[in-house]
Amino acid sequence: MADAWEEIRRLAADFQRAQFAEATQRLSERNCIEIVNKLIAQKQLEVVHTLDGKEYITPAQISKEMRDELHVRGGRVNIVDLQQVINVDLIHIENRIGDIIKSEKHVQLVLGQLIDENYLDRLAEEVNDKLQESGQVTISELCKTYDLPGNFLTQALTQRLGRIISGHIDLDNRGVIFTEAFVARHKARIRGLFSAITRPTAVNSLISKYGFQEQLLYSVLEELVNSGRLRGTVVGGRQDKAVFVPDIYSRTQSTWVDSFFRQNGYLEFDALSRLGIPDAVSYIKKRYKTTQLLFLKAACVGQGLVDQVEASVEEAISSGTWVDIAPLLPTSLSVEDAAILLQQVMRAFSKQASTVVFSDTVVVSEKFINDCTELFRELMHQKAEKEMKNNPVHLITEEDLKQISTLESVSTSKKDKKDERRRKATEGSGSMRGGGGGNAREYKIKKVKKKGRKDDDSDDESQSSHTGKKKPEISFMFQDEIEDFLRKHIQDAPEEFISELAEYLIKPLNKTYLEVVRSVFMSSTTSASGTGRKRTIKDLQEEVSNLYNNIRLFEKGMKFFADDTQAALTKHLLKSVCTDITNLIFNFLASDLMMAVDDPAAITSEIRKKILSKLSEETKVALTKLHNSLNEKSIEDFISCLDSAAEACDIMVKRGDKKRERQILFQHRQALAEQLKVTEDPALILHLTSVLLFQFSTHSMLHAPGRCVPQIIAFLNSKIPEDQHALLVKYQGLVVKQLVSQSKKTGQGDYPLNNELDKEQEDVASTTRKELQELSSSIKDLVLKSRKSSVTEE
């Protein structure tokens, strides 16, 4: 019972205390967070969340903990490790680093790590221990060991040299630190080694052989040489090719060089290189600063040799002879060096009599060359008179004399070109007219590309391309003949000099000979008879009339085709028959100017322009329009210009009547048929057959290039029987196939890897050739067999 009352009294006391106690207010966790965020937003409170979000920490506390962690870790800590220890975002760590570095000058940020001076002092002590042990340490090795940048380490260690580190850094190579004992030991080794050297030695070989530190060796060697302790020089600087040359060797070198130059008057660069002088030119310039020298490609010569050559050249010029300087020079000098020396010498004679240099070493005076030319004068007159008696020749103008000096060679015209022109004249007029007469001489010239008429149609399929012979050239003597002649008159001359002199004289001799020929032939042609000129005019009028009527009939045949085909046919007609008739008229006028040629087909656009420049103004206007009409696209315009030109030149053109037209048609057909009978070329067979079938079908002549044959065959589709047209188309396909096969074979050349392909193509070509041979007679029969009796159908 007593216990119960005791419990009651205790509860009453607790109740009384609760009644009189003051009330305590508590905030929830959520309310606390909202209040803190509000204060942070109003910038009344500056705190940072921890990464787990359970705590707030002030920036000052972050800085304090960073300093503590830096101290705990010995003065070097990574900021990533700080972030893990302090448990805040990395950006807050980085923000505080700047404040720490500003406030504490002994702390630095290096590659994301905080480092203080205490750490660097301990690092310097470790480096000093390594240095005293090995005698040298390299910054590169320390970078790998301590994982720090080289520039930072170099700066930090340099500040502690003499204070913590007992050593010094190489001023030329700040990547190595040495001890005084190490430097002294190496200096003694270097001094002893280089004192024993008596010939040029590569420094690099000594470094590898004796294990020297490269930069230290160069520094010590430079110091010893500059102080005079080592007598010698380092050639090539601090490079792999640096060479140490001892003074004793240099003195021996210099003695030999001076002696050789004094005795011979020249120095070879190769000889100096064999003596161990790497840069011979610089050595010579340095050695002979005040001596006048001439530097060549492989040697240098003194003024004595130059004066000797100059005197010989001067004597040759004054006496009007020649001199070869090669015997005057040392045999070791190359021809190239001799030529350079001669060029230098010749500058002194630039204002005196002109000279010519042959074979790089032979100087020939202008008087000697003129004397050589005069040796041929009598021979020229004899040959010119002989030519006058034996052969009729071209009359040569002053322009031709100028041209012959620039055109070294022009090719002789091919035989088929002349045959082509004769064939076209036969097709057009029915008459065979040769150019120049039976005794006309053809003067051959070497090849030169001719610019004129570059737009001529090329019709390889029909072999009817319109080309002309090259302009001939009168030649006096060939080079070997000139050489033989000179050998008889020039004694003791080198063969190479004779050959080059002959080559040099060819052009002036030919030019002089042309003048002699012209003067001789002019005197023999001044009495040309008027009867001969009348005969020439009559022949010209007949040929012009024939070609004029041909053009009219060809124009009529072109009108059966579409516009694009007509354009191609018109262009071909202008470049061929129209050009022929134009050249006939121009050549007729050129005869009065002494500019005529044997074959008018050889006249190019440039020659026509030259002839125009010599004509009177009245004739020039009409002929210029005729010349320009060849480049137009209208036959009517050409005919109009031709009428005006014929009237201006007093050439009477006979227009053909119906009877004359029938004769021309018959002669043209007969000429084509005769050519078809004898030819075996499939492309030409197809071309001639197509043109003849066209004439049979339309009673009109056609002058077409090979590339228009497909259009002619297409036109004949409705004009000839279907089986004949099918045969013609089949033959056309075989011809095209053969041409393509030939083109591929030409393009491939001779390659061993193409043997199988070549064999296959050869089989195809053989089959095509056989089929063409079988069909050729059938194709010819289309116009020959069935038309034999149709002689008078026109």
Curated annotation (Swiss-Prot):
Phosphoserine modified-residue sites: 458, 462
Region (Mediates interaction with CDK5RAP3), start-end ranges: 490-684
Mutagenesis or variant effect for residue 15 to R: Abolished interaction with E2-like enzyme UFC1
Cross-referenced InterPro entries: Ufl1, Ufl1-like_C, Ufl1_dom, Ufl1_N
Chain positions with Phosphothreonine modification: 536
Domain of life assignment: Eukaryota
Effect upon mutating residue 462 to A: Impaired recruitment to double-strand break sites
Entry's Gene Ontology cellular component terms: cytoplasm; cytosol; endoplasmic reticulum; endoplasmic reticulum membrane; membrane; mitochondrial outer membrane; neuron projection; nucleus
Subunit comment: Catalytic component of the UFM1 ribosome E3 ligase (UREL) complex, composed of UFL1, DDRGK1 and CDK5RAP3. Interacts with E2-like enzyme UFC1. Interacts with RELA. Interacts with NBN; promoting recruitment to double-strand breaks following DNA damage. Interacts (when phosphorylated) with YWHAG/14-3-3-gamma; sequestering UFL1 and preventing its association with PDCD1/PD-1 substrate. (Microbial infection) Interacts with Epstein-Barr virus protein BILF1; this interaction mediates MAVS UFMylation and subsequent routing from mitochondria to lysosomes.
Name this protein carries in UniProt: E3 UFM1-protein ligase 1
